[in-house]
Every structure is written in structure tokens, then in C-alpha cells.
Swiss-Prot record:
BP GO terms, sorted: mitochondrial electron transport, NADH to ubiquinone
A GO cellular component entry from the record: mitochondrial inner membrane
Coiled coil region boundaries: none
A Pfam family matched in the record: Oxidored_q4
Enzyme superclass (EC): translocase
Catalytic function, reaction form: a ubiquinone + NADH + 5 H(+)(in) = a ubiquinol + NAD(+) + 4 H(+)(out)
PANTHER family noted in UniProt: NADH-UBIQUINONE OXIDOREDUCTASE CHAIN 3 (PTHR11058:SF9)
Gene behind this protein: MT-ND3
Name this polypeptide is given: NADH-ubiquinone oxidoreductase chain 3
Family annotation (InterPro entries): NADH_UbQ/plastoQ_OxRdtase_su3 (IPR000440), NDAH_ubi_oxred_su3_sf (IPR038430)
Gene3D superfamilies per UniProt: NADH:ubiquinone/plastoquinone oxidoreductase, chain 3 (1.20.58.1610)
Length: 115
């Protein structure tokens, strides 16, 4: 009963908030207010310069490998199961996939900064 009540209240609250944001008028920002502030002077450089694609690729690679390391963390507890060959095989497969991904990224020069 408590679960149904909490689910109903949360659903109604989410629908209410979505309805309010849909029907509120759209605010149009002024160009003066959206300009970057640099000590009262006009900015010396544009504020919205594009960033390097190399940096983006390295950041995405870091996030992917960080997530996969988070998958490796519970392996010591998982290896205490009764079906040890299955857990060992799946652990080795995950590590092999990580190693193959790293070697592919390395061979494609995705981790090299200097060109």
C-alpha cells in the first residue's frame, strides 16, 4: 500500500511539474545578459570557442573504461560463487574485451596528443 501511494504521489508530482513547465511562458534572454562578463570590459576572446576533438575522444574513452572498471569491482565477491568456471570465464572475457578496446584505441592513435 505504501509503495502504491508513493508511486502515485511521485507520478502526480512529475506530471504537475511537467505541465507547469510546458505552460509557463518562454523567457527570451537578452543579448546583454547572455554575454560573458570579464571585469567590466568586453571579452578579449570569444567565450564559446570549440574544444578539441582529441580531448573529447580521450574524455569519452576515460568514461567508458572507468565504467568498465566499475563492472570489475564486484568480481572478487562474484568469484565466491559455487559456479566458479562460469564466473572465471565471464571475468576473463570482460578483461579481454577491455584489453582489445584499449589496443584498438591505441592503434587508431586515439590516445596520442602530439601529431
Amino acid at each position: 500500500m505504501n509503495f502504491v501511494l508513493a508511486l502515485t504521489v511521485n507520478t502526480l508530482l512529475a506530471l504537475l511539474l511537467m505541465t507547469i513547465t510546458f505552460w509557463l511562458p518562454q523567457l527570451y534572454p537578452y543579448m546583454e545578459k547572455s554575454d560573458p562578463y570579464e571585469c567590466g570590459f568586453d571579452p578579449a576572446y570569444p567565450a564559446r570557442i570549440p574544444f578539441s576533438m582529441k580531448f573529447f575522444l580521450v574524455a569519452i574513452t576515460f568514461l567508458l573504461f572507468d565504467l568498465e572498471i566499475a563492472l570489475l569491482l564486484p568480481l572478487p565477491w562474484a568469484l565466491q560463487t559455487t559456479n566458479l568456471p562460469l564466473m572465471t570465464t565471464s571475468s576473463l572475457m570482460l578483461i579481454i574485451i577491455l584489453a582489445l578496446g584499449l589496443t584498438y584505441e591505441w592503434s587508431q592513435k586515439g590516445l596520442d596528443w602530439a601529431e
